[in-house]
């Protein structure tokens, strides 16, 4: 049974979210409260401020699946980087082009109606990339596929993380 479902990681395949995240490096879940908060913060012009993270943090801490993954990262009030990205269909962005050696985590929060594509195990690969105008690095789709990273499509109709 594949753990990857359209609106979240399969609850049937995941009995321990922290162990699952440790193995796959990815966990996503549709969440209407998060979606509404993201939309509200965006409308208020505060989508990427430390204030926005504090608003989301309370609900994140109440979600047992996500809390088990994030709790060691939630001890600081201010994440290192808060960025906002819009739709950029056909582009694959990464934060790093080498396998992760530092203990860091990327938390995405999505507004209602978001569609996202992840690439399985891409965080374990070395890629060539170019600097993108949004501040991230862009990797060619052919390189990701050649690297054996299967596409995982997610639809966050209600929003999520």
Language-model features, listed with the residues they occupy:
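Non-heme Fe(II) oxygenase catalytic core, chiefly the N-lobe of the double-stranded beta-helix
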Residues: 2-7, 11-24, 30-159
């Amino acid at each position: 049974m594949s753990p990857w479902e359209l609106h979240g990681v399969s609850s049937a395949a995941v009995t321990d979210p922290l162990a699952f995240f440790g193995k796959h490096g990815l966990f996503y879940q549709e969440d209407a409260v998060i979606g509404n908060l993201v939309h509200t913060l965006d409308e208020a012009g505060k989508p990427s401020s430390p204030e926005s993270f504090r608003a989301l943090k309370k609900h994140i801490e109440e979600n047992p699946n996500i809390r088990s993954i994030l709790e060691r990262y939630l001890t600081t009030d201010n994440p290192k980087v808060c960025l906002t990205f819009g739709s950029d269909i056909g582009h694959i962005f990464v934060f790093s082009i080498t396998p992760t050696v530092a203990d860091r985590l990327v938390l995405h929060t999505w507004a209602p109606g978001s569609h996202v594509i992840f690439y399985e195990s891409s965080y374990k690969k070395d890629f060539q990339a170019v600097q993108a105008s949004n501040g991230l690095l862009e990797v060619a789709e052919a390189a990701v596929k050649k690297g054996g990273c299967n596409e995982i499509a997610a639809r966050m109709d209600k929003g999520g993380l």
